[in-house]
Amino acid sequence: MVLCRTLDERVWMLNRQGKAAIVATAQGHEAAQMGTVWALKRGTDRFYIYYRDLAVLVGLGMTPAGIMLGFVAKAGEPLSGARQFPVHGAHADLGIVN
């Protein structure tokens, strides 16, 4: 949860510096989101995330670097190739459905 909060704060700072265009904070939702990940079975269940589910991505094993690529709209972002809203898209290996 600390990693999620730290990522959220960094992205917020990037937005204030003009380096990340869109930011929707997930602060205060970390525990509920991590609980959701732990309650479901990876590899069996599917995850339908929304734009504030940063902790779900971290809980499923997405790297902070991959998450940051989406916020700064760079190629290589694993969910949508940085073509959609940050923290939104699909990832077959993690069971994330768009």
Kindly label every feature range from the protein language model:
Residues 1-3:
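Mature N-terminal segment immediately following signal peptide/propeptide cleavage
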Residues 6-9, 13-98:
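Cofactor-binding active-site loop characterized by glycine-rich and histidine/acidic residues
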